[in-house]
Amino acid sequence: MSQKFNAILLDLDGTLVNTLYSLQDTVNKALERFGFDPVTLEQTKKYVGIGSHKFVERSVEATANRLYREAEKWEEKDEDKAFDLDQQADEVMEQIDDVHDAYMEIFKENCIYKAEPYPGMRKSLDALKAKGWKVACITNKPMAEAVTVLNHAFGEGYFDYISGDDGTHPLKPDTGVVDDTLNHIGCKKEECIYVGDTNTDMETAKRAGIKSIGCLYGFRDKKELEEAGADVLIKSAEDIGKAIEYFEAE
């Protein structure tokens, strides 16, 4: 039986590589420079996925929201104190761009901190490459750091194409990145499968009209992936082959 598919497109953070610690460590170092609250690993999981600027914005917003909540508590007791807290929160939000600049500066050196491919990922991709499959990464991570992380985790030249945030195009879930990637690797939408761990990934695949695999081992939960329309869910990167067999049998 001939195979229906010949290309796999994968997200990076939470799908190919566990980068959670590098993301948290980097943003917390940036937040610390400005005296803002650090974020937890759980917050980091929720905040990432729509690009570095949005990640930083959400992380900064956590401090601002704490101040807004404190202001509400003081409204009846001390209006002046409540006003001051509101002002502080507003000032925090005004510094998002500055925090992002600091984040990007730190991230250049910190992007591979504790970053490792998920168990079974290399084996699964090697098996596909042995069958002649094209393997590409589509990420909202800054391009330079995406390449650095992938080279660190898989070796230089492992991927047929890498699409990252280079500031010249819309990010996922915009499907332009899918079209661009398929053009570069010479494959059609009906011949490829998309693998990711967030609602953004599933939405990208759905908009593009391609099959999707949702990764339960990544940064988001089953409920989010199901609601976002994942075609198949896997608990481990080792299960990618089984998911593809399911699609092949349809």
Which residue ranges define each predicted feature?
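Structural recognition of alpha->loop->beta junctions
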Residues: F154-I162, E224-I244
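Acidic, Mg2+-coordinating phosphoryl-transfer loop and its flanking beta/alpha structural elements
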Residues: I193-V232
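Conserved Lys-Pro-Asp/Glu-containing loop-to-beta segment of HAD-superfamily phosphomonoesterases
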Residues: A7, K172-M202
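Active-site neighborhood of HAD-like aspartate-dependent phosphohydrolases
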Residues: M1-K46, E57-R58
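An amphipathic alpha-helix signature
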Residues: Q24, N28, K45, G49-E61, ...
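Substrate-recognition/cap helix-loop segment adjacent to the acidic, metal-dependent catalytic center
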Residues: E32-F34, F55-A64, K114, R122, ...
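Metal-dependent phosphoesterase signature
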Residues: E61-K123
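Short acidic capping loops at alpha-helix termini that bridge into adjacent secondary structure
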Residues: P38-Q43, G157-Y161, K189-I193
